[in-house]
Amino acid sequence: MSKVSIVIPNYNGEKCLRECLASLKKQDYRDFDVIVVDNCSEDASLQVIEESEGELLLEVIPLDNNYGFAKAVNDGIKASGSEYVILLNNDAVAGRHMVGALVNRLEKEPDVFSAQAMMLQYNNRKLIDSAGDYFCVLGWGFARGRDEAASRYTGKCDIFSACAGAAIYRRKVFDEIGYFDENFFAYLEDVDIGYRAKIYGWRNVYEPEAKALHIGSAASGSRHNAFKVSLSARNSMLLMYKNFAPWQKVVNFVPVCAGILVKIAYFARKGLAGAYLKGIFSSFFKMK
């Protein structure tokens, strides 16, 4: 059994998946297997995966529909028997030392649930794509350091949560806190599980010695589109509803309302206010 399982959720990732898998073949740390969970892709993704089967210890889990990110990674995590699980986006390219650096961090710090790699922008490798996820009082989840110089983010630190695009998780903790919430489908499910881990007393950290390039928006399109805006709005509300203590819901009510108004104004300028409001209102039907 491998020390680490690398779970790659995939949906129509033919154009980027080949480079993702090629980067895993070059890792200096070798005690890992790869599990690709395919969300019923309509392109040649499965053919691309087959090309790597002889060079990687590789398993494919084909799903019969596009169930989204959360279910895909959950199925991959449950199929693994490893001590650690790395989640890697299909449009991410792992640096040669990524796997080893992430494993080393969790080995040294037993109170850590997740550790995120330094995610660099694929088309401008001097800029950060994500150096961890934060969640602010306005009810916004956002990527730490995005579009800033990578040279400013070379220090190890604790973060609110790890971006699941390139991060390692201590597998046993999922049995304690639960898996990724499949109601989220996609977006902010990594912030949600990081929040849950913190509630249970676990830490989430940033590991800059592990690096990955990230193309971004490979499955959904541009950074802002109706699909992403609506789902992100809905999931931000669900995240707070699930994880806030009663006193937090009271204290943060006004700041969260202010945050919603700011977002409405912002997305109105992009023609996406309707999508944002649709997401906010749809969240109420998911609250139990």
Please name every model-derived segment.
Residues 204-288:
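Active-site-adjacent helix/loop segment of glycosyltransferases
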Residues 23, 38-47, 65:
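A conserved acidic beta->alpha catalytic loop
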